[in-house]
Amino acid sequence: MGYPGAMRRSALLFLSFFPVLAACSNGTTDESAPPPSPRPWQRLATPTSAAMAEVRGLRPVRGILHSHSPYSHDACDGDGVQPGGGINVGCAQDLRRSVCDAAEDFVFLTDHADHMAEYDFESLLFIEAGDEPVKDAGGAVIANRIGCGDGRTVLITAGNENSLMSVGLERHVPGTAAERRAIYEGDDAATVEAMRAAGALVMIPHTEQRSLEYLAATSFDGMEIYNLHAAIDPDIRRDSLGLDSYAAAASILPFTKFDPEGPEPDLTLLGFFEDLPAYAERWDSILPVRHVTGIAGTDVHQNTFPSMMRDGERGDSYRRLMRWFSNIVLLGGELTPGALKEALKAGRSYVAFEILGVPVGFDFHAEQGGSTIEMGGRATAGGTLVARAPVVLDPDPAATPPAITMRLYRVTAGKTETAAEGLSVDLTDAAPGAYRVEVRITPHHLRPYLGYDADRYIRDSLWVISNPIYVD
């Protein structure tokens, strides 16, 4: 869905008015020595390969679902497509640079039918010299590996987001540009069939705006269990989340000030990050009935806060928003479009709000009869569910450690209950139900970067949300 014009303008109008080196220890125990200084804020994300280890032969890769490019009519401050049909080159370069700076391994672009339906498929992949186009068995280009210049690449796929979201298209749906647009903007079984026939997974964006009846009646592979746009858009907050329209926007203001003693701009999410029960309520209503993968949608457009922050970057930059959270997918082999979609459809993934700290060591699986069942899999009653809470990657010894908690939830028809809790869980003789894990964190370690009002932002928050394991 993205920003309807009025919604986007209301948020933009509101926001537009507001326009240390680490000390080295000498190894002594002199009590008069000053405490060590915290590390400088790290603007660039740590590559996944350096942050997360394999588990049982499964390699974690991080990425973005639900991202817009210049081919969306409202992206790039509404200036993505230029007169004459060219695209906003500066915005396209922002996107290419940001996926590398945010250390993503993959990005599923999901543009609005207006204008992505009008362009040939390869154009949607932003292929440039030095990239590695990905081809299918017949030689057609289906994806692109953007080169980061340091040996890393980021896998880019095309897709669309309107009422439904096609994730990982391998070609356009058939027809003329007008016919394609009509399909991409559809919301019925024929739309789902056409998207899947073009190689895509079908997911529900903006779940907060869908009724339980709609979700129960619609065929899809996954659904958003968090959407960043919804969390801050005044109209969606009021109409779909039951929240104060402008409270989130107001909470951003301290991060926009050019005050070196103020909070770090990259931590702006902490100003308005809160539990949004509408997502869990809808997801949990579906899980007892059928398998549905939960994903987090960044929904970045680079179109809401063009003013520069004190780090010299616009407030809603691709890099900044992409750093806030990722979908972590567990792969058994090479990172390919097909492998990614297979793992996502299976539910072998989890959501991590990495701006609170990169989670290292998270694990959730089932053990039964000598076999291991991964997230998204099915076990029979009587097996053991195993969950291990993560720790923060490379903690700063000068900072106060975070407080971490973990709960294992059992979801049955009309009921979500705590089945176990603790940093290490082994639940034996698991009863039937859909089981999912939530890890929460109180980010004391971020205090050095939150300025003079740090207590306002250091609060118990969602950190990791697993996909379910189903026990029959």
What are these regions (language model features)?
Residues 8-15:
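Sec-dependent signal peptide recognition
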Residues 21-23:
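C-terminal motif of bacterial Sec signal peptides marking the signal peptidase cleavage site
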Residues 25-28:
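Bacterial signal peptide processing site
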Residues 30-60, 64, 68, 72, ...:
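C-terminal functional module detector
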Residues 38-248, 260, 264, 273-281, ...:
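A metal-dependent hydrolase metal-coordination microenvironment
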Residues 251-255:
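Acidic/polar low-complexity surface segments
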